[in-house]
């Protein structure tokens, strides 16, 4: 009887686990709301509607690092402050008393700061710091109190550690950088995972505030190229790029030289102090009885000889003395 009862119980447990999963697969019912992705961040913002009502919303961004490139929602972001507009998941709190949430996708304008810092204890490692600030949500101004900062420790383009924490917006580096220097990202539908079709003719570039257009010539059998946006050649930009490369080279050089220099100084200091200590101990254990190289006058036998000194230039007195001795 016990074996007959245990079999239906196990079947019931199996059906209890399998039926909800089968229902999610066969029906169009959405899955339970999940948290941010593994490499994602949640930014709490406050938006103001046209009627003047404030609403609390949460923007979910997926930030990844792959082969030396930082991606925000699959959009490539370079070092500096980049302003991008992309579609992302937004969680809106409709009823605070019942804790009701509404999930939808909207167009979000975000400022992303990416900094690359060398690590002192390893020349091949670097720390990538990422900060994000939401500017607009579907054309509505957004405000936030805190900034989520992500620190990615990378060695040879391989992620070693991924950490994130919150800090006040006024204390962040992103807040201190003027929005006029932001790099504008054009054509936000570009994705690193998407395939470019044969009829797609528009290219995607990271653009600055000053933009020019370059006309493309149509090839036989293909659609004409859309005018491309490009930055005019500038000696200042080339100089900045060269200085940035020089700065990175100097950082790598000093990160490899400074540890060796400190090790050398440690060896020198320890050697000098150790030698002084050994000499002091030897002096205490084996003191010197007498000093060598000093003539001892007590042990010498001497005979005193009288010496008569004559004044200089007195020949007459000398002759008188000789005469007296003759008499």
Swiss-Prot record:
The gene is Ginm1. InterPro entries: GINM1. It comes from the Eukaryota. Residues 24-259 are extracellular. It is a single-pass type I membrane protein. Residues 1-23 form the signal peptide. One of its GO terms (cellular component) is membrane. Its main location: membrane. It is found in: Membrane. Keywords: Glycoprotein, Membrane, Signal, Transmembrane, Transmembrane helix. Residues 281-327 are cytoplasmic. Glycans are attached at residues 44, 62, 146. The chain crosses the membrane at residues 260-280. The keyword Nuclease does not apply. This is Glycoprotein integral membrane protein 1.
